[in-house]
Amino acid sequence: MNTNADPAEVQKFSDLAHRWWDPASEFKPLHEINPLRLDWIDGHCGLAGKKVLDVGCGGGLLSEGMAQRGAEVSGIDLSEKALGVARLHLYESGLQVDYQLTSAEAHAATHPAQFDVVTCMEMLEHVPNPESTVHACAQMAKPGGAVFFSTLNRNFKAYLFAVVGAEYLLNLLPRGTHDYAKFIKPSELSRYCRNAGLELVSLSGMTYNPITKVYALSRDTDVNYMVHARKLG
């Protein structure tokens, strides 16, 4: 299996996996951001009836949200514990999602051009070779299919907000959640997409108000941002 993965990163999320669906846990920011990213994805591609792959699905927050919107969803991850939590939560939600323990690269080798929509959210900044993941996501999308990414920009403001602010001042995330050196500039992600045969459709920032604790779409891509790309062909 091509595992383009940092074992320490996989272990970090495995250790917290049992708290994935607790909205007051370390995953609180994911719970707060999920409705926004779900609406954004659905608004761009129309999830109902689509065959969707969620890369780096973790405990299944986004996967279940997309299944709830009528998509036929598969989720892949390299954390067995996170996938166990995701599968267990299906009993509570009554939804259907096919979860598999595999990497994007390994799945791409056996599932080329299989999906109408591929999502890879809050994951690229946690792998050693993000360009490889982007390429794998592109491989798995059907020609004309939609591919979505979200990650963190790499600049001083992103360091202040996503690392110093979120991890040390506001305690929104456990310390060590993010490695600033792995943050990705929009220009870099755009280049990865072009090299993988993807055409950039839309770029949107996300901002967080610590007072109202609400995330909102924004033109400001300095910290969190999302990309919608389309597979050429």
Curated annotation (Swiss-Prot):
Please give the Gene Ontology molecular function terms for this protein: 2-polyprenyl-6-hydroxyphenol methylase activity; 3-demethylubiquinol 3-O-methyltransferase activity; polyprenyldihydroxybenzoate methyltransferase activity
Give the matching Pfam families: Methyltransf_23 (PF13489)
What pathway is this protein said to act in by its record?
Answer: Cofactor biosynthesis; ubiquinone biosynthesis
Q: Which domain of life is it from?
A: Bacteria
Catalytic activities: a 3-demethylubiquinol + S-adenosyl-L-methionine = a ubiquinol + S-adenosyl-L-homocysteine + H(+); a 3-(all-trans-polyprenyl)benzene-1,2-diol + S-adenosyl-L-methionine = a 2-methoxy-6-(all-trans-polyprenyl)phenol + S-adenosyl-L-homocysteine + H(+)
Entry keyword set: Methyltransferase, S-adenosyl-L-methionine, Transferase, Ubiquinone biosynthesis
Give binding positions for S-adenosyl-L-methionine.
R37, G56, D77, M121
EC number, as in UniProt: 2.1.1.222, 2.1.1.64
Q: Which GO terms describe its biological process?
A: methylation
| Group of enzyme by EC | transferase
The job of this chain, per UniProt, is described as:
O-methyltransferase that catalyzes the 2 O-methylation steps in the ubiquinone biosynthetic pathway.
Q: Which family does it belong to?
A: Belongs to the methyltransferase superfamily. UbiG/COQ3 family.
The protein's name in its UniProt record: Ubiquinone biosynthesis O-methyltransferase
Please state the gene responsible for encoding this protein: ubiG
